[in-house]
Amino acid sequence: MLYFRYGFLVVWCAAGVSAAYGADAPAILDDKALLQVQRSVSDKWAESDWKVENDAPRVVDGDFLLAHPKMLEHSLRDALNGNQADLIASLADLYAKLPDYDAVLYGRARALLAKLAGRPAEAVARYRELHGENAADERILLDLAAAEFDDFRLKSAERHFAEAAKLDLPAPVLENVGRFRKKTEGLTGWRFSGGISPAVNRNANNAAPQYCRQNGGRQICSVSRAERAAGLNYEIEAEKLTPLADNHYLLFRSNIGGTSYYFSKKSAYDDGFGRAYLGWQYKNARQTAGILPFYQVQLSGSDGFDAKTKRVNNRRLPPYMLAHGVGVQLSHTYRPNPGWQFSVALEHYRQRYREQDRAEYNNGRQDGFYVSSAKRLGESATVFGGWQFVRFVPKRETVGGAVNNAAYRRNGVYAGWAQEWRQLGGLNSRVSASYARRNYKGIAAFSTEAQRNREWNVSLALSHDKLSYKGIVPALNYRFGRTESNVPYAKRRNSEVFVSADWRF
């Protein structure tokens, strides 16, 4: 019901621009516009013979509004401008009962209700129907373009915004159209991001802790030692989303990252990894799905794979290719609301190593299954977590008459928390931890049983908004990793502290 006192109809909505004319603008209460609405409705009251008695609140029910169709239509238009879903729903149902109601106004109400209720596909369908029947209506054109943008139909949204930009519209409306077109260009243009940071690694050569074993009645101990090295971590990513039709896109994405110890004269310990995708992606307001074939490379700081006596070049910047492979990724992400998302992905690829001995054991296929979720808590915190399963199946099931012990299955879980500390002036923190079990097949080397690993990893990152400069955001990072195993040579322990500088352009 609507309540009336002192000759003014109190409509609980913000009178302002519509979804299309003011989309993406903050919701504000325009007191001047609201006063004009109230005065306009008050004039309608003055024309009626309904008198005020004892200054009591007057209740306006559906029958009264049906008896005053102009007042009902005026209120519905104001509710549309204010994006008030409950009020629109009540007034639209009443308005449709009028014998000579405006079908276009009613259609706009149903379309906006679908949009506000989180049904963007339905909203687009309704606006497209309205636009097909009323191609000259500027308001419907803008509402349609905004709805298509919200549902990530960027190609048609850009086309309709381009049409609107040619119309004789008020300057604020044209400015808003320009903002939408700029956003669309940013989403479909080339996007680059990357980072470079100094790092100190206490175990750059990935050596196992010192251990001893019995061999023919003699004790043999390892001689390798962990080597400390200062290096540079680097990462760069490029992405291009090309609209095809409606929610369908061609996606190109590539990334490469690694560590170089060039300045420590230990380039032999360099490592890197790169992957490039090119495939189909479906994307709308609620979900994203993709089929993405990819090519990947694994990089190394040394090319002396088979020639063990070859002298190592410890002052080399470009890495060598250690292994490469091709595969495909199937992925799906669902967002039930803006603050919560679920993701699942499947991967399959085949890898090939350059080194003959390693290729004999490690050429083969790898399958992965990944499930993750992220939840926004309030305005400044996000928690996330997931489960990962990976298996490696070597091309050669047996080597030298024994089961290939490079085959494994890995189960892992991880969780994390990201927080923006506004009370500290813009400090941002991110902490994550993971645990996994990796079980190998066959008998491990120098052992009588299969290898069983347990892997722990912890990472922490701190950054501050006030320290950013032209899109470059420095962060202090700490990483710790530990692997426990039933075979001594597979044990690992490593920690790293580094300052990163990430940027997007």
UniProtKB/Swiss-Prot annotation:
SS bonds (residue pairs): none
Membrane topology label: Multi-pass membrane protein
Signal peptide range: 1-19
Keyword tags: Cell outer membrane, Membrane, Signal, Transmembrane, Transmembrane beta strand
Family annotation (Pfam families): SlipAM, TPR_Slam
Subcellular location: Cell outer membrane
Segments of this protein annotated with the region N-terminal domain: 23-188
Residue segments, region C-terminal probable beta barrel: 189-505
GO CC field: cell outer membrane
TM region(s), chain numbering: 190-200, 232-243, 248-258, 273-283, 287-297, 326-335, 340-350, 368-377, 381-391, 411-420, 427-437, 456-465, 472-482, 495-505
Superkingdom, taxonomy of origin: Bacteria
SUPFAM superfamilies, per the entry: Porins (SSF56935)
Keyword set includes Transmembrane: yes
Domain notes: Consists of a soluble N-terminal domain and C-terminal probable beta-barrel in the outer membrane with 14 predicted beta-strands.
Family per similarity comment: Belongs to the Slam family.
Record's function text: Required for correct export to the cell surface of cell outer membrane lipoprotein HpuA heterologously in E.coli (hpuA does not exist in N.meningitidis strain MC58).
Protein name from the UniProt record: Surface lipoprotein assembly modifier 2
